[in-house]
Amino acid sequence: MAYPADFKYTKEHEWISADGKIGITDHAQSSLGDIVFVELPKVGATITKGQSFGSVESVKAVSDLFAPVSGKVTAVNEELATTPEKVNTDAHAAWMVKVELTNPSELNDLLSAADYEKFAAEEAGH
């Protein structure tokens, strides 16, 4: 799996794009299986780095979504309310929320695509 080089990643398997969109990685959606429900915050909500901001429910489990950065939610991907399976189809295009960062330096704490790919492979036992 190729992870977009312009995204930053967390060890909890979330990504953030340069424009502040947040989603889960292909590795995460593959581990979860068929996603049937996504719970997201409302526009205007504040999220805090490392804290849960929603959840993803699959046929296997419910998993919390952890904020890679702190910020204010400026948009929510409403498509996922009716078609959560889009996360399985293309995890790196199916963003969940868009945020306005309150502390852009938090991006420096995140993993590059190459580092995340190595981390995900080690976690999977490869």
Swiss-Prot record:
Keywords: Lipoyl. Disulfide bonds: none annotated. The keyword Disulfide bond does not apply. The modification N6-lipoyllysine is found at residue 60. Its cofactor is (R)-lipoate. It comes from the Bacteria. One of its GO terms (biological process) is glycine decarboxylation via glycine cleavage system. One of its GO terms (cellular component) is glycine cleavage complex. Residues 19-100 form the Lipoyl-binding domain. InterPro entries: 2-oxoA_DH_lipoyl-BS, Biotin_lipoyl, GCV_H, GCV_H/Fam206, GCV_H_sub, Single_hybrid_motif. Binds 1 lipoyl cofactor covalently. Belongs to the GcvH family. The glycine cleavage system catalyzes the degradation of glycine. The H protein shuttles the methylamine group of glycine from the P protein to the T protein. The glycine cleavage system is composed of four proteins: P, T, L and H. NCBIfam families: gcvH, PRK01202.1. This is Glycine cleavage system H protein.
